[in-house]
Design a protein with these regions (language model features):
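C-terminal subdomains that position terminal phosphate/3'-OH groups for nucleotidyl transfer/ligation
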Residues: 1-131
Length: 131
């Protein structure tokens, strides 16, 4: 934080540095750089953040990890997926009224969708709606 305050850095680069900081703030485990975890970061924070985090890990490590390089290359070509379930669909198909309940259901569906690497079945959607 003080570094960002002390030196004149653009807001865009400040955001990039903060994203890297928050990613590494949590304890790093073997699952931290799994594709499913990086997909979660990719969806919520964007392509640039994932690439920055992977590149920082490559620069920080003492030996070359080809898996990280391949992950980095794979994220250069990816686009952020759109969630297949929309509010209109839930309102028409399941007769859910607009409001907090609809928002909560959409949020739970989105979390499940991201957790399953951007895949969700109709059965999973129905289970979430009925709970």
């Amino acid at each position: 934080e003080y570094f960002l305050y002390k030196f004149n850095i653009s807001k865009k680069n400040q955001k990039r540095i903060k994203n890297i900081y928050y990613f590494y703030k949590d304890k790093i485990t073997s699952k931290t750089f799994s594709e499913s975890n990086l997909n979660r970061v990719f969806y919520y924070q964007g392509k640039k953040t994932v690439i920055d985090v992977i590149n920082f890990k490559i620069f920080k490590s003492k030996k070359l990890d080809n898996r990280l390089i391949e992950l980095s290359k794979s994220y250069y070509d990816k686009t952020v997926p759109a969630m297949p379930v929309k509010a209109d669909t839930l309102m028409k198909k399941y007769k859910i009224l607009e409001g907090k309940n609809l928002g909560d259901k959409l949020k739970m569906i989105e979390e499940e969708w991201v957790k399953n690497n951007f895949k969700i079945s109709n059965q999973q959607v129905e289970n979430i709606i009925n709970n």
